[in-house]
Amino acid sequence: MENIIARRYAKAIASRADINDFYQNLCILNSAFVLPKFKNIIESNEIKKERKMEFLDSFFHIKNSSFQNFLRLLIENSRLECIPQIVKELERQKAFKENIFVGIVHSKEKLSQENLKDLEVKLNKKFNANIKLNNKISQDDSVKIELEELGYELSFSMKALQNKLNEYVLKII
């Protein structure tokens, strides 16, 4: 449910001319969500809405009236806890708008930057988009490339290759 709500807010922000200002401000608030005290204040029903607004305003040196109105809207609708999802969805929409997609390469060993760049170049050509890859270490012997936004997943497993080779050898015999 929160993802649907976050998607609507992010879509509205993405259509604004000052999307970057909103995004930067939301990132500031999003970074505070790792603090348990911050989350307690945001989620508390005992703290008045005006005090929450003052608290959130204290994070910013330059006041943006549009952003303040947005925060008031979130406070009124008790949706401040949706900020991390809004940031994530806004990042996704910005990337889609700029034709930039982030993918993950799962591998047993850390890949060199050169290998990642080589994969990025090949995927850029295949999808005609700007692909950025991150390496994630996994325990299995397979290599897997995930581009969630494009609905693309490629995996290569040594076990599967060995099984197919065994089947092929058995067929020949």
Curated annotation (Swiss-Prot):
Subunit-level organization: F-type ATPases have 2 components, F(1) - the catalytic core - and F(0) - the membrane proton channel. F(1) has five subunits: alpha(3), beta(3), gamma(1), delta(1), epsilon(1). F(0) has three main subunits: a(1), b(2) and c(10-14). The alpha and beta chains form an alternating ring which encloses part of the gamma chain. F(1) is attached to F(0) by a central stalk formed by the gamma and epsilon chains, while a peripheral stalk is formed by the delta and b chains.
Family listed: Belongs to the ATPase delta chain family.
Keywords, alphabetical: ATP synthesis, Cell inner membrane, Cell membrane, CF(1), Hydrogen ion transport, Ion transport, Membrane, Transport
Entry function: F(1)F(0) ATP synthase produces ATP from ADP in the presence of a proton or sodium gradient. F-type ATPases consist of two structural domains, F(1) containing the extramembraneous catalytic core and F(0) containing the membrane proton channel, linked together by a central stalk and a peripheral stalk. During catalysis, ATP synthesis in the catalytic domain of F(1) is coupled via a rotary mechanism of the central stalk subunits to proton translocation. This protein is part of the stalk that links CF(0) to CF(1). It either transmits conformational changes from CF(0) to CF(1) or is implicated in proton conduction.
GO CC annotation, single: plasma membrane
Keyword Ion transport found: yes
GO molecular function: proton-transporting ATP synthase activity, rotational mechanism
Organism expressing this protein natively: Campylobacter jejuni subsp. doylei (strain ATCC BAA-1458 / RM4099 / 269.97)
Gene from which this protein is expressed: atpH
Protein name: ATP synthase subunit delta
Presence of the UniProt keyword Lipid metabolism in the record: no
InterPro entries in alphabetical order: ATP_synth_OSCP/delta_N_sf, ATPase_OSCP/dsu
Its membrane topology: Peripheral membrane protein
Subcellular location(s) of the protein: Cell inner membrane
